[in-house]
């Protein structure tokens, strides 16, 4: 398999790479499923984890919050919600980029069977005119908040309004400094929608569930948290029903994504990977393109009709 991967590694131009993917999609007659990662959203201003400008490159000490921390001591939730409060405006205002629009176009033309995304930014949904039933957000979405006790749900925008009301000093700073990203309060945005904070957040307040006084948590799968079984099973079925898999913008470092690639490979499904930088699935791919996603997907969508 390794020799086959090297033989099909595309080292040429954007046009060459797009041409290779045109052949890949056409060969599988609309039964290719996509798996997308953070690299798809970098052109929308949301950084990835491991890319050249990713959070791990910018901050070697970065550690995302763990599920057990969030449900543990109060201080962890204070820190999380303070960071999320400051990061939310940029996430909520982010716009789909060329990658999202190209993927939406490919699906509308029936060239792909569905899209499994690791991203929690909601940009795949914003790129389509009609709600896409074949989009699966395996790690959830930042746009909703759930009570972990009773299941009460509210939109993240409503949560932001509540946080503004009970933290007027921080809100006033944010209102007066909407573009300030490296000041005393906050530095740059992280992939999970929060920011690094450089101030004492011990007085930051956050609301509890209005129904049962339980803990409110963003509707995302934290590190150390199990993916819902229904989501896992749906992702497996999408892979099983497909004839091929195209991975875009993911290093496949997270097991929930890597296992989908391994599942496809275990049944002999052809795999193509478009990602700038190494991925854990490289040895399983028949086509490997080491480029960013936007230019290649835009060329692909403009070529294939």
Curated annotation (Swiss-Prot):
NCBIfam families: PRK05333.1 (NF003738). It catalyses: N(6)-acetyl-L-lysyl-[protein] + NAD(+) + H2O = 2''-O-acetyl-ADP-D-ribose + nicotinamide + L-lysyl-[protein]. NAD-dependent protein deacylase. Catalyzes the NAD-dependent hydrolysis of acyl groups from lysine residues. GO terms for cellular component: mitochondrial matrix. Keywords: Metal-binding, Mitochondrion, NAD, Transferase, Transit peptide, Zinc. Its cofactor is Zn(2+). It is an enzyme of class 2 (transferase). The lineage of its organism: Eukaryota, Fungi, Fungi incertae sedis, Chytridiomycota, Chytridiomycota incertae sedis. Its EC number is 2.3.1.286. Pfam families: SIR2 (PF02146). SUPFAM superfamilies: DHS-like NAD/FAD-binding domain. Belongs to the sirtuin family. Class II subfamily. InterPro entries: DHS-like_NAD/FAD-binding_dom, NAD-dep_sirtuin_deacylases, Sirtuin, Sirtuin_cat_small_dom_sf, Sirtuin_class_II, Ssirtuin_cat_dom. It comes from Batrachochytrium dendrobatidis (strain JAM81 / FGSC 10211). It is found in: Mitochondrion matrix. Residues 11-305 form the Deacetylase sirtuin-type domain. Zn(2+) binds at residues 147, 150, 209, 212. The active site is at residue 139. This is NAD-dependent protein deacylase SIR4. GO terms for molecular function: histone deacetylase activity, NAD-dependent; NAD+ binding; zinc ion binding.
């Amino acid at each position: 398999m390794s020799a086959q991967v090297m033989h099909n590694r595309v080292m040429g131009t954007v046009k060459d790479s797009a041409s290779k993917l045109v052949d890949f999609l056409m060969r599988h007659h609309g039964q290719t499923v996509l798996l997308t990662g953070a690299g798809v959203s970098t052109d929308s201003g949301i950084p990835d984890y491991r890319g050249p400008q990713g959070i791990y490159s910018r901050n070697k000490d970065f550690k995302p919050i763990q599920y057990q921390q969030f449900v543990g001591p109060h201080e962890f939730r204070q820190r999380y919600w303070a960071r999320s409060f400051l990061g939310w405006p940029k996430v909520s205002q982010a716009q789909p980029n060329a990658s999202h629009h190209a993927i939406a176009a490919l699906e509308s033309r029936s060239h792909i069977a569905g899209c499994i995304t690791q991203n929690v930014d909601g940009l795949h949904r914003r790129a389509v005119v009609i709600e896409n039933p074949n989009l699966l957000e395996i790690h959830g979405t930042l746009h909703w908040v759930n009570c972990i006790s009773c299941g009460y749900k509210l939109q993240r925008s409503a949560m932001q309004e509540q946080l503004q009301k009970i933290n007027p000093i921080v809100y006033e700073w944010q209102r007066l400094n909407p573009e300030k990203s490296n000041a005393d309060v906050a530095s740059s945005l992280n992939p999970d929608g929060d920011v690094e904070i450089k101030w004492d957040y011990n007085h930051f307040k956050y609301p509890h569930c209005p129904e049962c006084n339980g803990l409110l948590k963003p509707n995302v799968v934290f590190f150390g948290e199990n993916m819902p079984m229904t989501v896992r099973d749906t992702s497996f079925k999408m892979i099983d029903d497909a004839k091929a898999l195209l991975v875009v913008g993911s290093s496949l470092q997270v097991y929930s994504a890597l296992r989908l690639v391994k599942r496809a490979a275990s049944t002999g499904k052809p795999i193509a990977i478009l990602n700038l930088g190494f991925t854990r699935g490289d040895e399983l791919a028949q086509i490997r393109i080491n480029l960013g996603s936007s230019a290649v997907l835009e060329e692909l969508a403009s070529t294939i009709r």
